[in-house]
């Protein structure tokens, strides 16, 4: 294991350490360096951020010279490293070299174990870091068999091995574990085989399903049964299907859904593990409207409820909120539309029309990055989801890797080879577009954040950039000037009034409210009053509440009072929303229930 390469002449590094006003940042570090930012208030209470990069000649993690490198952390500079990967919780990191796999502790860099196995192509840690799954191409070394192996990480010994001729990133990992590693599953020829998670190979249960192509375990639930989602593609006149099973009663499904136009699909579980989104694809469009096939989106819950959003045009990206029972879809021809939905498929917020195809929620669910990558220009918008306000916009041309750090403050973009062979490198910015770190790395193949538990980071107060910061960080394209006019005196700048908090909203932005009539149409009962008329003057006096006879409310009257209270809360929330004040996403759900409250109130009043 070689020392970190600190003097790479082909590497250009740019760092910026000034944080936003009133914004403290956790320390940024890397596996080849422990860094200390200018802000130290959080370094004793929050973990250090870390990321890994791998290029043609180097595999290391680096943040910048002035942050202070940690030479105890591993680095490879001989070009032998073929892949690098963190464990699910970020405590371990594996370097896949030509002849071995070196597993190190992410914090100190000490070697945890070494697996002597050449030519490994893919690896995957089990959720609790008990096992490492590896796959290699069949060769003379493995006698063209037993190329899929489960290793005991501590002992670096083989626990299970079998043959697997084909493997790609879409179906990897080929063996999957539940979050607690109690149960494992593997797709084998029209069946899903389930094993004891610590005794792979001993069959416990199986699901038989003709032409099944994928399955996914639900996230961990507190003491509940394990749930499995399966997908079967359409075949001829037979529709595709998605099903939800509950282990161990896998002989029958809990809920199912059938659909056409689904030769492939991506199945996404929500955070509670009780509903899935099925993002379907086809290679061709029979209607002839697209060269790239057709897409669809279906919702299926464990209790059997389901719906299709009937979205017109391509679906570019779908993501569940990491904290709420909501999901977001980016869809339509360019400029595309991005919409936040609830579990009933009702739209909550439209984020406007823009050339975007990527959705990235921050781990704490308070921030959102909408980007346009791939064949788009790399434009990005950062949104405050606590107020539904656009914070700022920026660009990252040709970015391949885009992801939030665990602190929900920093965002990394990376231009990677071999897809893009020029301008390779990484850039780390804050949500207000403050550039924290930038490095050009020729022939960069990998870049990724170290996984950390987002709950250990405090939710920072969201700070909006000033007008001057927005102008400096996002320069506007210049108007073309003919050469004959370039020496002429420039026109004086146009003075504009300062915008309100946040960047301008895109065209089509909309927050949906319930279509019901305002609850102000409900008139609460007035207290008894007496009216007297003297000299054409009418005087109304209201008896003090203390003079009213007291009596216990009936159950129906108590329910009416409770509904009235909810309607008053809705009125307050609507006023806050209209005035641009803070309103959490959960409050939108309450506003949308206004019609339901009114109907309940009318029904209760009719029972009096």
From Swiss-Prot:
Keywords noted in UniProt: Coiled coil, Initiation factor, Protein biosynthesis, Repeat, Translation regulation, WD repeat
Stretches of the chain forming a coiled coil according to its record: 550-608
Composition-biased stretches (Low complexity): 466-478, 520-544
GO BP term, example: regulation of translation
Function noted in UniProt: Functions in the early steps of protein synthesis of a small number of specific mRNAs. Acts by directing the binding of methionyl-tRNAi to 40S ribosomal subunits. In contrast to the eIF-2 complex, it binds methionyl-tRNAi to 40S subunits in a codon-dependent manner, whereas the eIF-2 complex binds methionyl-tRNAi to 40S subunits in a GTP-dependent manner.
Family: Belongs to the WD repeat EIF2A family.
UniProt name for this protein: Eukaryotic translation initiation factor 2A
Organism, scientific name: Dictyostelium discoideum (Social amoeba)
